């Protein structure tokens, strides 16, 4: 069958059309159309570049009008550079911190001394102040090999989402084992800033993160709690790539868990995202909803500890004041598990979990 009409390309084309026509992304077909150079299609000088620095520079200037050209260059250098001794997970966690909390740049104080300040890379408060571009068939050159990706989604020039698509009749696990794993080996720098990986054959879809094994890629099949489950690709795209949802996921629903001496990147599952956001809305209206805030119920093994972390972190980040969060358990083992999760996911500010465990009423009052 001719390339222009192959089934996987039709899935790819329909993906780009949904992103562009329904969700408001700009769509670019780069396969044999990309013009390299600063004034080219995407502003890439070479196929090795994975950050669209032209678009990143414009975003930094738009979000931080105070930045000088020197500071813009410094910020871009921090966003794109890494040490060869770093693992992919270490790089990814570092870049995620810049995306979420701002990239450090040097600023001169009136007294002549310098200080480090954070420049925003994303505008989480105003969705329309960000630029969303979905690029199909983008050639990326690694140290040895070159690969052509199906769809890469950029926000402010940063490649946040990698989408691998297969034919309807193929098992989507092949997208993981045959394609994604190969890209990790051949063009690993594409995943330095990656927030999430989507794998689909159109009829079935899963999403995961850098470092996730196949069994930890999950379906995203509901847009609201009342929806019937639908595992097809359009549901996942609408649930994750809607601009407001993507920025919310990026800001509030990604964790790096340092338990057990290793680091695991956690993206909220569909039910956690919906449930936590419902709980956040209840907290927002807590005064008028006193006595009927509701219960966020979990089955065993569905991630209740992470849901607590997501909820606590979003409330602390999005609301004024310093809310006190009390976690009650009915077993010492569960008490330790949840407190360790809070510590290992960075919610305790570097302090040890045991400092926050209350053993009596007096402890709790303190």
Kindly label every feature range from the protein language model.
Residues 330:
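Conserved H-loop
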Residues 343-366:
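Inter-Walker segment of RecA-like/P-loop motor cores
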Residues 2-324, 333-349:
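ATP-dependent helicase/translocase motor core
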